Regions:
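Conserved acidic carboxylate
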Residues: 36
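Two-component/phosphorelay signaling modules centered on CheY-like receiver
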Residues: 39-57
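Alpha4 helix (beta4-alpha4-beta5 surface) of REC/receiver domains from two-component response regulators
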Residues: 43-46, 91, 114-131, 138, ...
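Short hydrophobic/Thr-rich beta-strand motif most characteristic of the beta2 strand and flanking loop
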Residues: 53-62, 68
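Acidic catalytic/metal-coordinating carboxylates
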Residues: 61-64, 87-91
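Short amphipathic alpha-helix used as the core "switch/output" element in two-component signaling
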Residues: 67, 90-103
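Active-site beta3 strand of CheY-like receiver
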Residues: 72-78, 83
Length: 153
Protein backbone atom coordinates (compact mmCIF):
# COMPACT_ATOMS: atom_id res chain seq x y z
CA UNK A 1 0.00 0.00 0.00
CA UNK A 2 2.81 2.44 0.88
CA UNK A 3 4.57 1.63 -2.37
CA UNK A 4 1.37 2.40 -4.30
CA UNK A 5 1.06 5.80 -2.57
CA UNK A 6 4.73 6.52 -3.30
CA UNK A 7 4.31 5.65 -7.00
CA UNK A 8 1.16 7.77 -7.26
CA UNK A 9 2.93 10.75 -5.69
CA UNK A 10 5.95 10.29 -7.95
CA UNK A 11 3.71 10.07 -11.00
CA UNK A 12 1.88 13.25 -9.95
CA UNK A 13 5.19 15.10 -9.57
CA UNK A 14 6.36 13.97 -13.02
CA UNK A 15 3.05 15.00 -14.59
CA UNK A 16 3.15 18.37 -12.82
CA UNK A 17 6.67 19.07 -14.12
CA UNK A 18 5.71 17.96 -17.64
CA UNK A 19 2.63 20.19 -17.81
CA UNK A 20 4.40 23.08 -16.08
CA UNK A 21 7.14 22.99 -18.72
CA UNK A 22 4.59 22.72 -21.53
CA UNK A 23 2.60 25.65 -20.12
CA UNK A 24 5.72 27.79 -19.88
CA UNK A 25 7.34 26.76 -23.15
CA UNK A 26 6.58 30.11 -24.79
CA UNK A 27 8.26 32.00 -21.95
CA UNK A 28 11.50 30.01 -22.04
CA UNK A 29 12.99 32.28 -24.69
CA UNK A 30 11.88 35.55 -23.05
CA UNK A 31 14.85 37.32 -21.48
CA UNK A 32 14.08 39.65 -18.57
CA UNK A 33 16.48 42.07 -16.93
CA UNK A 34 15.75 43.14 -13.35
CA UNK A 35 17.37 46.48 -12.45
CA UNK A 36 16.88 46.95 -8.71
CA UNK A 37 19.37 48.15 -6.08
CA UNK A 38 17.81 46.20 -3.19
CA UNK A 39 19.27 42.69 -3.43
CA UNK A 40 16.46 40.99 -1.48
CA UNK A 41 13.73 42.41 -3.70
CA UNK A 42 15.77 41.66 -6.83
CA UNK A 43 16.12 38.05 -5.66
CA UNK A 44 12.39 37.76 -4.88
CA UNK A 45 11.40 39.07 -8.32
CA UNK A 46 13.96 36.74 -9.91
CA UNK A 47 12.51 33.69 -8.13
CA UNK A 48 8.94 34.58 -9.16
CA UNK A 49 9.87 35.06 -12.81
CA UNK A 50 12.18 32.05 -13.02
CA UNK A 51 9.40 29.88 -11.62
CA UNK A 52 7.27 31.05 -14.54
CA UNK A 53 10.03 29.97 -16.95
CA UNK A 54 11.68 33.25 -17.89
CA UNK A 55 15.43 33.67 -18.44
CA UNK A 56 16.52 36.23 -15.85
CA UNK A 57 19.43 38.67 -15.67
CA UNK A 58 20.14 41.18 -12.91
CA UNK A 59 21.72 44.59 -12.42
CA UNK A 60 21.96 46.73 -9.29
CA UNK A 61 22.11 50.17 -10.96
CA UNK A 62 21.20 51.84 -14.26
CA UNK A 63 24.75 51.85 -15.68
CA UNK A 64 25.11 48.12 -15.09
CA UNK A 65 21.60 47.70 -16.51
CA UNK A 66 22.55 49.50 -19.72
CA UNK A 67 25.64 47.32 -20.02
CA UNK A 68 23.45 44.21 -19.61
CA UNK A 69 20.99 45.49 -22.23
CA UNK A 70 23.85 45.65 -24.74
CA UNK A 71 25.03 42.17 -23.76
CA UNK A 72 21.83 40.09 -23.41
CA UNK A 73 19.22 42.05 -25.42
CA UNK A 74 16.31 41.52 -22.99
CA UNK A 75 12.71 41.46 -24.15
CA UNK A 76 11.62 43.23 -20.96
CA UNK A 77 13.05 45.16 -18.03
CA UNK A 78 11.68 45.28 -14.50
CA UNK A 79 13.14 48.63 -13.50
CA UNK A 80 13.30 50.60 -10.26
CA UNK A 81 13.32 54.41 -10.56
CA UNK A 82 15.44 55.30 -7.54
CA UNK A 83 18.83 53.79 -8.28
CA UNK A 84 22.35 54.67 -7.07
CA UNK A 85 24.82 56.35 -9.39
CA UNK A 86 24.44 59.08 -11.97
CA UNK A 87 21.54 57.58 -13.94
CA UNK A 88 18.13 56.76 -12.47
CA UNK A 89 15.48 54.39 -13.80
CA UNK A 90 13.61 57.11 -15.72
CA UNK A 91 16.84 58.09 -17.49
CA UNK A 92 17.46 54.48 -18.48
CA UNK A 93 13.86 54.03 -19.62
CA UNK A 94 14.06 57.15 -21.83
CA UNK A 95 17.35 55.96 -23.32
CA UNK A 96 15.93 52.52 -24.10
CA UNK A 97 12.76 53.88 -25.66
CA UNK A 98 14.52 56.45 -27.88
CA UNK A 99 17.33 54.23 -29.15
CA UNK A 100 16.07 51.48 -31.51
CA UNK A 101 19.59 50.00 -31.60
CA UNK A 102 18.97 48.80 -28.03
CA UNK A 103 16.07 46.62 -29.18
CA UNK A 104 13.20 48.66 -27.68
CA UNK A 105 12.44 46.26 -24.80
CA UNK A 106 9.25 46.59 -22.80
CA UNK A 107 9.73 48.36 -19.46
CA UNK A 108 7.84 47.77 -16.21
CA UNK A 109 8.67 50.40 -13.61
CA UNK A 110 8.47 49.02 -10.06
CA UNK A 111 9.02 51.81 -7.55
CA UNK A 112 8.06 53.30 -4.20
CA UNK A 113 7.06 56.52 -5.96
CA UNK A 114 3.30 56.37 -6.24
CA UNK A 115 2.10 59.95 -6.62
CA UNK A 116 0.14 60.75 -9.79
CA UNK A 117 2.94 63.01 -11.07
CA UNK A 118 5.46 60.16 -10.59
CA UNK A 119 3.27 57.76 -12.55
CA UNK A 120 2.81 60.37 -15.30
CA UNK A 121 6.59 60.92 -15.46
CA UNK A 122 7.20 57.17 -15.71
CA UNK A 123 4.72 56.70 -18.53
CA UNK A 124 6.04 59.82 -20.29
CA UNK A 125 9.54 58.30 -20.12
CA UNK A 126 8.18 55.38 -22.13
CA UNK A 127 7.31 52.78 -19.48
CA UNK A 128 4.82 50.17 -20.63
CA UNK A 129 3.56 49.60 -17.08
CA UNK A 130 3.98 51.12 -13.62
CA UNK A 131 3.71 49.29 -10.29
CA UNK A 132 4.01 50.91 -6.86
CA UNK A 133 5.88 49.10 -4.06
CA UNK A 134 4.75 47.15 -2.22
CA UNK A 135 3.24 45.51 -5.27
CA UNK A 136 0.98 42.52 -5.82
CA UNK A 137 3.20 39.72 -7.17
CA UNK A 138 0.36 38.26 -9.27
CA UNK A 139 -0.15 41.66 -10.90
CA UNK A 140 3.56 41.80 -11.82
CA UNK A 141 3.38 38.30 -13.32
CA UNK A 142 0.27 39.24 -15.34
CA UNK A 143 1.93 42.37 -16.71
CA UNK A 144 5.16 40.55 -17.58
CA UNK A 145 3.26 37.76 -19.34
CA UNK A 146 1.13 40.23 -21.32
CA UNK A 147 4.11 42.32 -22.41
CA UNK A 148 6.22 39.28 -23.34
CA UNK A 149 3.35 37.84 -25.40
CA UNK A 150 2.90 41.22 -27.08
CA UNK A 151 6.60 41.48 -27.98
CA UNK A 152 6.54 37.94 -29.42
CA UNK A 153 4.02 38.99 -32.08
Amino acid sequence: ENRKVFLNRTLMKVLFLFFWQAKNKYTMSARILIVEDHADLRHLIRMMLEFDGYEIYEASDASEGLEMVHRVRPHLLVLDIMLPGGMNGLDLCRLLKTNPALGLPAVVLVTARGKPRDIEAGLAAGADAYLVKPFNSMKLLEIVKRLCEKSAH
